[in-house]
Amino acid sequence: MSKKQTNTKGWSGHDADQWMAVAHMSGKRGVKGMCLKTCRLAWQIPAKYPSAIVAWNNTPKKHKFTDPMKAPVGVTHFWKGGKFGHVAIQSSKPGYVWTTDLPIKDTVGKIYYTGVTDAWGSIYLGWTTQLNGVDLNV
């Protein structure tokens, strides 16, 4: 039996939310097309999957949920679209996510979750309590 993986810093969803807020306020750049990496960094967890859609497809069903308005702070939201899909982090404001490339390309921003679909035509899949095989502390 494998050992349950948790993030190495013991961070909570609020810590991930704050990490993204700081990235936004500092004008962090160089995140274009790096949604999965940015979310991993916010949670301080290692790389595992090559894209957001692969991460979603490898997340066990018991960690997947569909109502975005019930998402706790810090969970990861996923969309299907393009070659790699998209992932973002739930902010402390219900329905709003921290994301890369929206509303401004190559930066971290906070938008209403439907903004990903509106901007790119991506299909909302749901949110998870696990990322890259690591249980999120939410």
Regions found by a protein language model. Name each.
Residues 48-113:
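...with weaker cross-activation on analogous glycine-rich loops/strands in unrelated enzymes
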